[in-house]
């Protein structure tokens, strides 16, 4: 991404009232202007997260990331054993490297979370939890497999490792819900969002519409803004995100966790905003209907469950 345009884009994000930015890839640690961009984001008051495979992390780089206020490192984990993870990543010794640098990350006051894409490399979720806990992670989030996307994002693969039938995916979601009941380890996916994903698989109507394009956006390396990385819809350049017309159309095209999970969290806040807007327009009954929607209480309970994202 052009660094000057990215800098202007961050300023536009600030003007738009956006509260956080997540740097992902590819591998964002390869971007030569990453540190200066993170520093600018923090100066503008944006919360910062970074997704990486961790291979390029060094003690000096961790200190640099800490110095510019990075709050969360999300590190990709592919399997429940050192051998399987390193082989799939194609980086011999990667697991040992992560085990060495994770204490340094935590000492630098950066939260360290494991991101695990559901795949056939994972045979036992309990073994997976033990693996990421032993490495030194403080929590994990499950990402759902993507076999195809319509945006420019390349984080998908039409591969048997991540190709599942609806029945197989439903079983995965059931296992995650069971794991959350049994495990003391922090699993960041909210129960309500996992249950919504199961409803979607079964063709049931969604209760919590996706807020991508309204509260969350995806910008690619060309700094073109998409409503999300599943759909092809583009909204304009990042430098103009403060002038983009948000999209709110109750989309149910995918179950991508990084949009659907926070959409559950923010449902009650959006309902409150709808209530206040209705009252300002003199639509009192409509406002109370929005305020007293029972889904608001489920959303608030889910937000308490997701407090680890907010700490």
Question: Where do the language-model regions lie?
Answer:
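Radical SAM enzyme [4Fe-4S]-AdoMet core and its adjacent flexible, acidic
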Residues: 1, 47, 66-72, 76-211, ...
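Conserved alpha-helical substructure of the radical SAM core
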Residues: 1-72, 311
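Residues that line or immediately flank small-molecule/substrate-binding pockets and catalytic motifs
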Residues: 25, 77, 144, 232, ...
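Flexible, active-site-proximal loop/turn residues at the rims of small-molecule/cofactor binding pockets
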Residues: 27, 56, 79, 146, ...
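Alpha-helix N-cap/loop-to-helix initiation residues
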Residues: 30-31, 58, 94, 121-122, ...
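Flexible mid-to-C-terminal extensions adjoining Fe-S/redox cofactors in radical SAM and related proteins
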Residues: 204-207, 222-311
């Amino acid at each position: 991404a052009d660094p000057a345009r990215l800098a202007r884009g961050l300023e536009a994000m600030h003007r738009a009232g956006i509260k956080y930015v997540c740097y992902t890839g590819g591998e964002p640690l390869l971007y030569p202007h990453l540190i200066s961009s993170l520093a600018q984001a923090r100066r503008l008051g944006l919360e910062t997260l970074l997704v990486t495979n961790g291979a390029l992390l060094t003690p000096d780089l961790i200190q640099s990331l800490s110095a510019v206020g990075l709050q969360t490192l999300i590190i990709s984990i592919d399997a429940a054993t050192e051998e399987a993870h390193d082989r799939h990543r194609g980086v011999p010794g990667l697991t040992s490297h992560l085990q060495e640098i994770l204490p340094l990350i935590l000492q630098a006051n950066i939260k360290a979370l494991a991101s695990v894409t559901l795949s056939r490399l994972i045979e036992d979720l309990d073994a997976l939890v033990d693996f990421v806990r032993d490495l030194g992670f403080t929590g994990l989030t499950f990402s759902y497999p993507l076999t195809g996307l319509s945006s420019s994002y390349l984080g998908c693969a039409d591969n048997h490792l991540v190709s599942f039938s609806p029945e197989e995916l439903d079983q995965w979601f059931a296992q995650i819900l069971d794991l959350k009941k049994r495990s003391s380890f922090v699993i960041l996916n909210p129960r309500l969002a996992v249950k919504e994903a199961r409803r979607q698989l079964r063709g049931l109507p969604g209760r919590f519409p996706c807020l991508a394009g309204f509260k969350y956006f995806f910008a690619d390396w060309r700094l073109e803004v998409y409503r999300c990385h599943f759909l092809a819809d583009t909204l304009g350049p990042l430098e103009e995100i403060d002038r983009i017309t948000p999209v709110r159309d109750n989309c149910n095209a995918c179950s991508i966790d990084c949009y659907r999970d926070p959409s559950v969290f923010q449902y009650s806040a959006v309902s409150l905003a709808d209530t206040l807007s209705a009252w300002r327009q003199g639509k009192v009954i409509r406002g109370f209907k929005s305020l007293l929607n029972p889904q608001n209480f489920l959303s608030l309970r889910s937000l308490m469950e997701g407090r680890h994202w907010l700490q």
